[in-house]
């Protein structure tokens, strides 16, 4: 096995925009700033919004439908 070919695996701190601090290990070598984490992501917090695209689909079908096809 070759020596000194693997990157250094060091402890880093990942800080989320919500203020949550996560200590982990990585080969990145520097601290990270996260946009979202498990504490503030809508999927994990239960604050999901359902996006209604029904109006867009109807508008698309109306715009690109072939006249007399129905």
From Swiss-Prot:
GO CC term, one of those recorded: ribonucleoprotein complex
Organism domain of life: Bacteria
UniProt keyword annotation of RNA-binding present: yes
Keyword list, A-Z: Metal-binding, Ribonucleoprotein, Ribosomal protein, RNA-binding, rRNA-binding, Zinc
SUPFAM superfamilies per record: L28p-like
Gene3D superfamilies: Ribosomal protein L31
A GO MF term: structural constituent of ribosome
Coiled coil residues, start to end: none
Cofactor binding comment, as recorded: Binds 1 zinc ion per subunit.
Protein family: Belongs to the bacterial ribosomal protein bL31 family. Type A subfamily.
Xref: NCBIfam families: L31, PRK00019.1, PRK00528.1
Subunit structure: Part of the 50S ribosomal subunit.
Function: Binds the 23S rRNA.
Protein's recorded name: Large ribosomal subunit protein bL31
């Amino acid at each position: 096995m070759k020596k000194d070919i693997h990157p250094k695996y060091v402890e880093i701190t990942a800080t989320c925009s919500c203020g949550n601090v996560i200590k982990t290990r990585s080969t990145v070598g520097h601290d990270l700033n996260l946009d979202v984490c498990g504490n503030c992501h809508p999927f994990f917090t239960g604050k999901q919004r359902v996006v209604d695209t029904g109006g867009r689909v109807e508008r698309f079908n109306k715009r690109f439908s072939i006249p007399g096809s129905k």
